């Protein structure tokens, strides 16, 4: 039984991280409401929750600027427009590995191809 590897695009990974931060911040602040009898603990929960939500906003702004600089391409598998960050990425829709580097065509997909160490080789 062969294992099918599933890749996801970098933009979607970062957006998912920011969304998790929003929900984690809200849940943390809800924990502050549950501990309202212990005032100092409630304040800590609210501050941590607020910082998480603010950090998620910063991540969303950052990924928005990255998304504007990403190269738009048409996926050869699903023929939908997607964006690529780096030398290798995955389609946002069908998870198909993509590359714009002719040297990497036909080679097994690996995210290490985006690292600076690999580019120097």
UniProtKB/Swiss-Prot annotation:
<keyword id="KW-1133">Transmembrane helix</keyword>
<keyword id="KW-1003">Cell membrane</keyword>
<keyword id="KW-0812">Transmembrane</keyword>
<feature type="transmembrane region" description="Helical">
    <location>
        <begin position="14"/>
        <end position="34"/>
    </location>
</feature>
<dbReference type="InterPro" id="IPR020912">
    <property type="entry name" value="UPF0295"/>
</dbReference>
<dbReference type="GO" id="GO:0005886">
    <property type="term" value="C:plasma membrane"/>
</dbReference>
<keyword id="KW-0472">Membrane</keyword>
<comment type="similarity">
    <text>Belongs to the UPF0295 family.</text>
</comment>
<protein>
    <recommendedName>
        <fullName>UPF0295 protein OB0906</fullName>
    </recommendedName>
</protein>
<dbReference type="Pfam" id="PF11023">
    <property type="entry name" value="DUF2614"/>
</dbReference>
<feature type="transmembrane region" description="Helical">
    <location>
        <begin position="43"/>
        <end position="63"/>
    </location>
</feature>
């Amino acid at each position: 039984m062969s294992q099918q590897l599933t890749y996801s695009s970098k933009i979607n990974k970062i957006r998912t991280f920011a969304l998790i931060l929003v929900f984690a911040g809200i849940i943390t602040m809800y924990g502050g409401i549950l501990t309202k009898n212990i005032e100092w603990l409630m304040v800590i929960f609210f501050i941590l929750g607020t910082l998480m939500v603010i950090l998620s906003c910063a991540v969303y702004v950052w990924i928005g600027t990255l998304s504007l600089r990403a190269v738009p391409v048409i996926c050869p598998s699903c023929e939908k427009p997607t964006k690529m960050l780096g030398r290798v990425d995955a389609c946002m829709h069908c998870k198909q590995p993509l590359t714009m580097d002719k040297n990497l065509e036909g080679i097994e997909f690996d995210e290490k191809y985006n690292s600076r160490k690999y580019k120097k080789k």
